[in-house]
Structure formats: C-alpha cells, structure tokens
C-alpha cells in the first residue's frame, strides 16, 4: 500500500436530529465538530434522516390501497365487457 493516500477510517457519531438518536459508525467522513459520549471524544455529524427515523424502517409508513389497478378497472368498466352492441 502506498503511504499517505488512504483516508483515515475512524468511529464517528452521527446524530439523527429528527429522532434525537446517536449512532456510532465507522466512517472516513471529514468533520470539524466533536462530541463526547461515554467518556470518549468522537467526530460528530448531524443528519436529518436515518434508519432510526425513516418511516420505512420504523414501521410508521403510510399504507396504500391494496386494490390493484386491474381490479379498479374491472369495477369501473367491467359492465361494458360482454355487453351487446346494437
């Protein structure tokens, strides 16, 4: 490996501001801010959405109508099928 070309890999604290949750993750992100957690100082990054707050991961997502578009079409226009023209 060539010296001095690889980014520094370290543990970084990401703060999900919408859920007020802190997550420690290994990362190469550069940051100016630091935070102290559990007596240890870590680089600190704020984020708006993470798996702690995203509706898909929390199970609080909106449910959509389970009726398919084909079923809706049949309900609206099914009576035209098989009708005699005349």
Curated annotation (Swiss-Prot):
<dbReference type="GO" id="GO:0003735">
    <property type="term" value="F:structural constituent of ribosome"/>
</dbReference>
<comment type="subunit">
    <text>Part of the 50S ribosomal subunit.</text>
</comment>
<dbReference type="InterPro" id="IPR027493">
    <property type="entry name" value="Ribosomal_bL31_B"/>
</dbReference>
<dbReference type="InterPro" id="IPR002150">
    <property type="entry name" value="Ribosomal_bL31"/>
</dbReference>
<dbReference type="InterPro" id="IPR042105">
    <property type="entry name" value="Ribosomal_bL31_sf"/>
</dbReference>
<comment type="similarity">
    <text>Belongs to the bacterial ribosomal protein bL31 family. Type B subfamily.</text>
</comment>
<dbReference type="GO" id="GO:0006412">
    <property type="term" value="P:translation"/>
</dbReference>
<dbReference type="Pfam" id="PF01197">
    <property type="entry name" value="Ribosomal_L31"/>
</dbReference>
<keyword id="KW-0689">Ribosomal protein</keyword>
<dbReference type="GO" id="GO:1990904">
    <property type="term" value="C:ribonucleoprotein complex"/>
</dbReference>
<protein>
    <recommendedName>
        <fullName>Large ribosomal subunit protein bL31B</fullName>
    </recommendedName>
</protein>
<dbReference type="GO" id="GO:0005840">
    <property type="term" value="C:ribosome"/>
</dbReference>
<dbReference type="InterPro" id="IPR034704">
    <property type="entry name" value="Ribosomal_bL28/bL31-like_sf"/>
</dbReference>
<keyword id="KW-0687">Ribonucleoprotein</keyword>
């Amino acid at each position: 490996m060539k010296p001095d070309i690889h980014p520094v890999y370290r543990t970084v604290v990401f703060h999900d501001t919408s859920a007020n949750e802190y997550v420690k993750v290994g990362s190469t992100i550069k940051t100016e801010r630091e935070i102290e957690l559990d007596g240890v100082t870590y680089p600190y990054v704020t984020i708006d959405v993470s798996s702690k707050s995203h509706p898909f991961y929390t199970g609080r997502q909106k449910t959509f109508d389970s009726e398919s578009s084909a079923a809706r079409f049949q309900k609206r226009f099914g009576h035209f099928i098989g009708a005699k023209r005349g």
